[in-house]
Amino acid sequence: MSLDNKTLNKPLIFATGSSIRKDIAKSFGINCDFIKSEVDEELIKLNFQGNKYHELAIQLATEKSLTISDQYKDYYVVGVDQVCCINNEILNKPGNKENAIFSLKKLSGNTHYQNCGMAICLNGKIVWQSSAVAELTMKPLSLDQIEEYVELDKPFNCSGSYKFESHGKDLFSNVKGSEYTIQGLDIDQLLDILIKEGIING
């Protein structure tokens, strides 16, 4: 897939405030508007039934896309979200040092999953939905190693409490799935559908 700047054939918005998702999109030549979508993520998670967390990720992404789509007529709106889970438990973004250490202690020596959900909406209607899942096994880490990592990367706004694009990748013994899925945007799937829909040039 070419990394050159893509020509936008139709108006496009990314419903995200995530700097890493912006960076990924721009690195693949997608230059469009980025607008943070305000949805009650915790309420959606609270009301979610079952343990198919890729479906929850899709639901969150769709709500974000629809919220912006309702405000911008004739714009294609991409919504993306991510759900980190271990043993049927969702790990939210830590927000602070203490929570990050707590989450990493749970992940240490264990396997968890990053679920990336994506949606595209147009004029308040769903055009496309999809998901991708990455499986990650973290090395057994001592408390000192965890604290040292948290101080190094400060992953307070990161799903899973680690920055895979930085030093976080060194925490793992095994990874199955795309690094972009782990970072919260399955760019390969997204580019394919944007080209298929004629929103951008290939």
Task: Describe the function of each predicted region.
Residues 1-76, 89, 141, 188-191, ...:
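N-terminal polybasic phosphate/anion-binding patch
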Residues 21, 83-86, 170:
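Short, active-site-adjacent cap segments at secondary-structure transitions
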Residues 25, 61, 81, 100, ...:
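Residue-level signal for inorganic ion chemistry
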Residues 36, 86, 120-122:
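Residue-level signal for short segments within beta-strands and strand-turn junctions
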Residues 56, 82-112, 138:
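Active-site-adjacent loop/tail segments of enzyme domains
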Residues 117-118, 125-126:
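Anionic-ligand binding region
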Residues 129-201:
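Active-site oxyanion/phosphate-handling segment shared across diverse enzymes
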